[in-house]
Design a protein with these regions (language model features):
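Conserved N-terminal entry element of GNAT/NAT acetyltransferase domains
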Residues: 1-12, 154-160
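Acetyl-CoA-dependent GNAT
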Residues: 8-14, 19-78, 102, 108, ...
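Conserved acetyl-CoA binding element of GNAT-fold acetyltransferases
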Residues: 79-90
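Active-site acidic-Proline motif in GNAT/NAT acetyltransferases
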Residues: 89-91, 95, 123-124
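Conserved acetyl-CoA pyrophosphate-binding loop and the N-cap/start of the following alpha-helix
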Residues: 92, 96-104
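Conserved active-site alpha-helix within GNAT-family acetyltransferase domains
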Residues: 99, 123-142
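Conserved GNAT acetyl-CoA-binding A-motif
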Residues: 110-120
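Conserved beta-strand-loop-alpha-helix junction that forms the acyl-donor binding cleft
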Residues: 119-128, 147-150
C-alpha cells in the first residue's frame, strides 16, 4: 500500500531542495538561470527563515516540492502566501500530488490568516495553466511582472 505525506523540509535537506529547483528549472527551460547554491539555500531557508519548503513523499521517497514565503497586500491589508516553486516529478504527475501540495499550502495560508495565495506561471505552460484554473485560480491578466536583477539593482541604486 502506498503512503503519501507532506512534510516540512529538514535543515539537512538543502541539497535536495536545490535538486528539485534544478529539476523545475529544466522543465521550465530555464536551467541556465539557476544560481542558487546548497549553502545559500541552507542559510536562506534554515538560518534566516526567508522562505519555507514542503516536500511531497510517496513511500518515503520525495516526489514533489513547494517553496513559498509571505508577502503583503496593502489592498487586502493582510499578508499573503506567495508560491515561488511547485514541482512534481514527471513520472508522478496526474496522481494528485501537485493538488495535494497546493491544498496543503491553502490550508496553511488560512491558518496563518493570509488574505490570498499567489504565484506566477509561464505563459506556454498550458498543463499548469489548466490545472490552476481547475482549482479556481484566476490569471491576473491586467498585471505585468517587473524585475530588476542584482546587477540592475546595483546600477539603479548607485545611479544618479
Amino acid at each position: 500500500m502506498t503512503t503519501f505525506t507532506i512534510r516540512a523540509a529538514k535543515e539537512n535537506e538543502a541539497a535536495t531542495v536545490l535538486e528539485f529547483i534544478k529539476k523545475l528549472a529544466e522543465y521550465e527551460k530555464l536551467a541556465h538561470e539557476v544560481e542558487a547554491s546548497e549553502e545559500g539555500l541552507h542559510e536562506a531557508l534554515f538560518v534566516r527563515h526567508e522562505a519555507e519548503v514542503v516536500f511531497a513523499e510517496e513511500d518515503d521517497a520525495i516526489v514533489g516540492f513547494a517553496l513559498f514565503f509571505h508577502n503583503f497586500s496593502t489592498f487586502v491589508g493582510r499578508k499573503g502566501l506567495y508560491l515561488e516553486d511547485l514541482f512534481v516529478l514527471p513520472e508522478k504527475r496526474g496522481l494528485g500530488y501537485g493538488k495535494a501540495l497546493l491544498k496543503h499550502l491553502a490550508k496553511l495560508a488560512l491558518e496563518r490568516h493570509c488574505g490570498r495565495m499567489e504565484w506566477v506561471c509561464l505563459d506556454w505552460n498550458q498543463p499548469s495553466i489548466d490545472f490552476y484554473k481547475s482549482i479556481g485560480a484566476v490569471p491576473m491578466a491586467d498585471w505585468t511582472i517587473y524585475r530588476l536583477t542584482e546587477e540592475k539593482l546595483r546600477v539603479f541604486a548607485e545611479g544618479v
